[in-house]
Amino acid sequence: MIRIAYLLSQYPAVNHVFMLREVRLLRKQGFEIHVASIRPPDRDLGALTSVEHQETQSTNYIRSMPVGRLVAAHGYTLLARPARYLGGAVRGWRLAGFKGLLYFGEAVAVGDWMRRKRLPHVHTHYAATVGLLISHIFPVTLSITFHGPGEFVNPAGSHLGEKVAASLFSCAISRYGASQLMAVAKCTDWPKLEITPLGVDLEEFSPRPFRPAPSPFQMVSVGRLAPVKGQHVLIAAVERLAKSGHCFVLRLAGDGPDLRALQQDVHARGLSECVIFEGNLNQDQLRGLYRQSDVLVLPSFAEGLPVVLMEAMAMAIPCVASWVDGIPEIITHEVDGLLIPPGDAEALANAIARLMDDVDLRQMLGQRARAKVLEKFNLERNVARLAAVLRQRLPGDGAAVGR
């Protein structure tokens, strides 16, 4: 059995629910997965689903580690591997200054936990710098899943080439992501790259009843409330729809630093009656919201391979999204969804109005969207693809080569 440490930035988390699905399916595939999370869950335990709550019971939360355990981890590692320990501190400082020293401290905590559990390999999502330092200090191998888009904006500052070089292999969730890694990695490291798309559970996200004449028309947008997600463009677009006499409700699911500014924008435009802020929703609540929705809108300025699009499309909800980064790998314009130039409120309003006014188009795009997810973003099939990569790339027992 291959034994792996999964190092995640925050687990479970509303915005990273795909990680929970991936971990649980890999276990069903026969892998022994032990999860370490840098931060605790993003919600109180009472707001978690039963599955999420179950996962917290076996997860090692690094920033909640008792001080005594942390001191013991550092003391043991310094005595057992002094050169690697001190070299890890120096490398952390070089990578990210004072923040890099925090990453170094976390790396020692995770690496010592791996030593005690005899875990020879660490795979990381959203914690690649900590993973890099673990592989420097401890005799373990490293693999990384890169999501984007943030880390692709400043690849030198994110040290992407160095991380790919240090890894046994690295995964991109889209062809776009793989191209960005190829742009910064040495060509001799290109054979390390794998494309492992995300996916959704097609039974959990089954088609919702189609509504030919909704009143009001229900729109939903799901994602962190942050400037990069483009929600202000969506607010400007729906103002145009309101002025043209369309009857609708827009529900924004998510939370984030832009909440107050978005609320003020909605109020200033006189849209408070038709724009509702739902806050963070767990998966059960989100599926309920999808079932009430006639269209999903994702007006982002940058994206990796957004799972929210896959979820909505799996439920036969037509989608309107920005033509950026990995999104065209999910939606083919006017075949199984509509794509618009990022930042163009007029184009976004026109695309939504097309779906409001054309019942046949709305139904056709929803049906084709479901078919696209069945073909390319089936969760079990895509996790099986990742499992095949792990089996091919790791030794039979997952053991790392010592140093």
Task: Label the model's feature ranges.
Residues F301:
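Aromatic "clamp/platform" in nucleotide-sugar-dependent glycosyltransferases that forms part
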